Amino acid sequence: MLDMSEARAQPPCSPSGTASSMSHVEDSDSDAPPSPAGSEGLGRAGGGGRGDTAEAADERFPACIRDAVSQVLKGYDWSLVPMPVRGGGGGTLKAKPHVKRPMNAFMVWAQAARRKLADQYPHLHNAELSKTLGKLWRLLSESEKRPFVEEAERLRVQHKKDHPDYKYQPRRRKSVKTGRSDSDSGTELGHHPGGPMYKADAVLGEAHHHSDHHTGQTHGPPTPPTTPKTDLHQASNGSKQELRLEGRRLVDSGRQNIDFSNVDISELSSEVISNMDTFDVHEFDQYLPLNGHSALPTEPSQATASGSYGGASYSHSGATGIGASPVWAHKGAPSASASPTEAGPLRPQIKTEQLSPSHYNDQSHGSPGRADYGSYSAQASVTTAASATAASSFASAQCDYTDLQASNYYSPYPGYPPSLYQYPYFHSSRRPYASPLLNGLSMPPAHSPSSNWDQPVYTTLTRP
C-alpha cells in the first residue's frame, strides 16, 4: 500500500509550498498570486513527468502510425464537432464559464498530496490514491491540518473578493442523463445514413431530441445520391431531423416493409399521392417483377406505352390514340411489358422500388393522374373486344381469367367509367394471376386492328 510514516511526514512540509501550489492548481477558480517557490517547483516537476509520459506513450507506436494520425487530425476542423451541453440549464449555453466553489481544507491537502504522490508512484490508480488520501486526512492531527485549513480560508476570502455575487447551486442529478443523450444525438447527427430515408412514424424522437438539434445542427440537409424525391420535398418543410432518425432505423433494420397506413400522406409529393388513398397496401405487390424490368417480350404493336409504376406495368397502349395523355415508358424497355412472374416474395423491395429516384427522374409519373383515366377510359370501348379475346385465350390456362376482364375495372375509383381497371386480385389467393392479367391488358393501340395480334407466350406461375 503506502508507507504511512512517509506520507504523514510529507504534508506539513513548508505550508507555503503545498498551500500555494494548491491555489495554482485551480487557477481558473482563484486569482490568488501563487508563491513562486512552491508552486513552480511542483509545477515543473509535474510538467516534466507529464511530458515524459507523453513521449513514452508516443514511443509505443511506430513513426508511420504517428505521422498518419497527425496527418488525419490536422485536416479536421474540431470546431465543427457538436459539443454536448452539460448542466441543468435545459441546453442553454451559458455565456460566462462555470465558477467553481472555493476548495475546502481537505481539497487543498488532497490535491497537493496527489500531485506529489502521482509523481512518486505513477502506477497508483487515481481512485485508490483518493481513498488513501481520505484515510490519511482522518488520521491527521489538528496541528497537521492547520496549514491546509488556513490556505482554504485564504482561498475562500479570495474567491469572495473575485466573485462577490457567487451563489453555490448544486447540479441536479438528472443532468447526467441529459448530457449523455446530448452527446449521443450529436454522434447521430454526424452519422446520418446514405440510404433513402422515409418518414413512416417519425414522430419518434421529435420530442426527445428536440433541444439538441438546435445546437448540434451544423451540416445541411441530407442529400445522398439515393435520397428519393419525397425526402427533398419534406426537407423544404423543415422535417429533416425526424427523417434522419427514421431513416437510420429503416436502413439498420434491413429495409423493413413500410406500413403505408402510417405514412403521413400529406407530406408525400402530390403527384405520387393523388390517388393513393384508395389503394390497398397489398396491391403494390402485384406490380413487382424481381429485377424491375421486363421478363417476357411482347409484340411491338401491343405495348407502345408500357407504363411502369415502381417497376409495375400497366400497359396503357391507349396513350397513342390521345395526344393529351402522357406516354409512360420505362426507361430501359419501351417495347416490353414487365411481367411480375416472381411477384410473391418481393415485399421488401417494393419500398425501394416504388420510391426510388430512378423512377422519379426518368418518368414523369407518380400514380396515374386523373386526366389519364379519362383518356384511357375513352378507349375502353375500342379495347373491350381485344381484352375479351385475350381473356378467352388463357381461360384454358391454370385459372379462368374472364372474371378478371369483366366490364368493371377500377371500381374503387368512383368517378371513372366502370370499364377500365378493377383489382379482383386484392386477395392473396388471386395474386399469382396478376402477370397474365397485366400482359393480357396490353391492349392494341386504337389504329391497329384489334383481331390480328399474336398471343404472347405465358409461363406457368408458381408461388415460391
UniProtKB/Swiss-Prot annotation:
Tissue expression from the record: Brain, gut, limb, and testes. Slightly in liver, ovaries, spinal cord, lung and heart.
Region Dimerization (DIM), residue ranges: 55-97
Motif (9aaTAD): 418-426
Residue spans of biased composition, Polar residues class: 354-366, 448-464
One GO CC term, this protein: cytoplasm
UniProt keywords, alphabetically: DNA-binding, Nucleus, Transcription, Transcription regulation
Location, primary (coarse class): nucleus
Comp. bias regions, Gly residues: 40-51
Region: Transactivation domain (TAC), residue numbers: 347-464
Top-level taxon in the UniProt lineage: Eukaryota
Compartment(s) of residence: Nucleus
Compositional bias (Basic and acidic residues): 154-168, 206-215
Biased composition (Low complexity): 303-315
Name of this chain's protein: Transcription factor SOX-8
Lineage: Eukaryota, Metazoa, Chordata, Craniata, Vertebrata
Gene: Sox8
